[in-house]
Amino acid sequence: MSRLNEIGFDFENDLLVAVGDLVDRGIQNIECVDLLNEDWFTSVRGNHEDLCIQGIDDQAARNCHISNGGEWFYNELSPGDQERMVEQFKELPIALEVNHNGKKYGFVHGHIEQNDWNEFARNEGVSVFRDPAQLAMWGRERLNSDNLQYTHVKGIDAVIMGHTVTEKPFKRDNCYYIDTGAVHWATLTILDLETV
């Protein structure tokens, strides 16, 4: 909250959109999830929220979750609290569109396979070979690849993503990567859409 106060965040009029991974990134897991109850806050679903959802019923997902910071979920929460949190996470969108000052911004946690936002939005969750919803939470290909198949994403002014830690905020085409390692180096990036 101190970072929001530093930048002059207006809790009455501004909206903070998180790019997922509200949990498993430090010791304030519950406090971060509680932000979902605030009118000024929303988030897309990240792979760590997905691990909570999957880990309830799938031992392999649970093991993966535990080895990636999720032990608190199984050790500190009652089964009822786990279920309530999972229900909150199921409500989080895989992708979110925000209109601001005549521009359209897209938010996903990890990756967008398509170079067209509208195609991505229509096909989210339906793919013969690569599930766009899973890629949106787990993928890194657009950032970690010099593959020429990934270009400017049409139909949206900017796509904002997290998931892959970069030393500083990074832009490729109209995609912004803003995970600067808050979990590792306490460097929290807040991107003001006025500057995009």
Q: Where in this protein do the model-derived segments appear?
A:
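N-terminal active-site segment of His-dependent metallophosphoesterases
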Residues: 1-34
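Catalytic phosphate/metal-binding cores of nucleic-acid and nucleotide-processing enzymes, i.e., regions
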Residues: 10, 16, 60-61, 77-80, ...
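Active-site neighborhood of phospho(di)ester-bond hydrolases with catalytic His/Asp-centered motifs
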Residues: 16-20, 43-46, 107-108, 157-164, ...
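Short, solvent-exposed loop/turn segments at secondary-structure junctions
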Residues: 24, 49-50, 111-114, 165-167, ...
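Active-site neighborhood of divalent metal-dependent phosphoester bond hydrolases
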Residues: 29-98, 102-103, 125-139
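Short, well-ordered beta-strand micro-motif
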Residues: 97-99, 107-109, 190-194
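Divalent-metal (often Zn2+) His-rich catalytic cores of metallo-beta-lactamase-fold enzymes
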Residues: 104-127
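Conserved beta-sheet core of the metallophosphoesterase superfamily
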Residues: 139-196
